[in-house]
Amino acid sequence: SDDAVIKGTQAYWRFDRHEAGSPLSQLDVIKDLSGNCNDLILKTHFPSDKNTLRWSDAHHPSQPGHGSLNFTAQKKPLKGMYLQTRNGAKINSNTFENGYTFEAFYYLPSSWDSEQNAWSSLFSRRGSAGDAGIHGEEADKDEPIVTLSISNDRELQWRVYPLESQNGTTNWGHETPFDQWWHAAVVNNGSMTKMYVDGSEVARNPAQKAHGLTTLNKPWMLGGFEYGGKLDQIFYGSIGDVRIVDRAISPEEFMFRPDLDSSTGK
């Protein structure tokens, strides 16, 4: 059994055991190691060089899996590759009413460029606020209903539209330093949401209530971001292990375990 598959794990993806530097192909399927069949399939925004998404053996020192995906996409003109769950995957309809924990390891290289790479997602849910019937004063009808984004200042942004709400909620992380691996976690206990970076709670967590996540039963994307219902941006950088759990977990349960040096394999 995999230690990273804890109680309530809905999806767990890792990217090790591949030839580093080789591109992904349309035949590659990222298996969901939780056993829930929420596998990821490759999507390409044409025209794209097939080398815009590659396997890598780079990883955060405390990451369970010893590998990652290296994305080299751009916005103008939009090109690149991303992954998504299949239509009908169980996790597409999950509303996380009892809480959630989303975790991802990520890395931004110093070649990251705000003009080309800002407002991309580590992961996001397809479907816009407007399509979900959300029209509050602070709602942006074109925004995706769930996204963990990288802003123009390289800040993490968890921007979501909770259930029974006509407006979204936002958690902000700090500016991400280049050329270093980070662990991001967003934890909701059914009513409040907190973001953590490398196990520490960020300063800008909102006080407003947030219950569950709106869904239009569409796929989740890894590395893709929609705006106005169309693909708008693709990630630039690297993404390591990603885990989604349908409950709030404590920082001690995070995949980020600084007490473990993964090079020992323990």
Locate each region found by the language model.
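Short surface loop/edge beta-strand patches of beta-sandwich-type extracellular domains
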Residues: 1-4, 42, 70-100, 168-175
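Extracellular, beta-strand-rich glycan-interacting domains
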Residues: 1, 10-20, 101-110, 232-261
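Acidic glycine-/aspartate-rich tracts in secreted/extracellular proteins
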Residues: 15-22, 107-113, 128-129, 162-164, ...
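Glycan-recognition/cleft segments
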Residues: 120-159
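Short, aromatic/His-centered strand-loop micro-motif at the edge of beta-sheets
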Residues: 156-183
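Flexible glycan-contacting loops in extracellular carbohydrate-active proteins
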Residues: 205-238
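Extracytoplasmic low-complexity segments
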Residues: 1-80, 133-142, 210-211, 254-266
